[in-house]
Regions:
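Intrinsically disordered, low-complexity segments enriched in polar/charged residues with Gly/Pro
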Residues: 6-7, 34, 41-42, 71, ...
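Residue-level structural signal for beta-strand termini and adjacent loop
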Residues: 20-21, 67, 109
Length: 111
């Protein structure tokens, strides 16, 4: 992993990709650690009753994948201070995710 510094970053730079395919086992482990038992994340039956085709991943699990993308990109000394996310659809175990980002703002803090 290369270390990225603010001087190396320009508006419009691409980040990624990080390609993932979350599994049901990962979802079950995540919801267990998170401490939730919300049906749409744990039960196909409940998820279907809410209009989904099966269980879905919680938004914070999706955001964790994006955090993984960004912290892997910026290196050990990098700091992720804010992450803005637009959720466009639900994600289910087995979906192939192509996580990418675009630098839209640069703010130097502490100088």
């Amino acid at each position: 992993m290369n270390q990225i510094y603010i001087e190396d970053v320009d508006l419009g730079d691409d980040v990624g990709p990080l390609v993932l395919e979350p599994t049901r086992d990962q979802l079950d482990a995540f919801t267990k650690v998170w401490g939730t038992s919300v049906g749409r994340f744990t039960s196909d039956e409940v998820a279907k009753s809410e209009g989904f085709t099966g269980v879905i991943l919680p938004g914070n699990m999706s955001m964790a994948f994006l955090g993984q993308l960004l912290t892997g990109w910026c290196g050990y000394e990098g700091k992720l201070r804010r992450l803005d996310v637009d959720f466009r659809r639900s994600i289910q175990p087995g979906d192939k995710l192509n996580c990418t980002g675009i630098i839209t703002d640069i703010e130097v803090v502490g100088q």
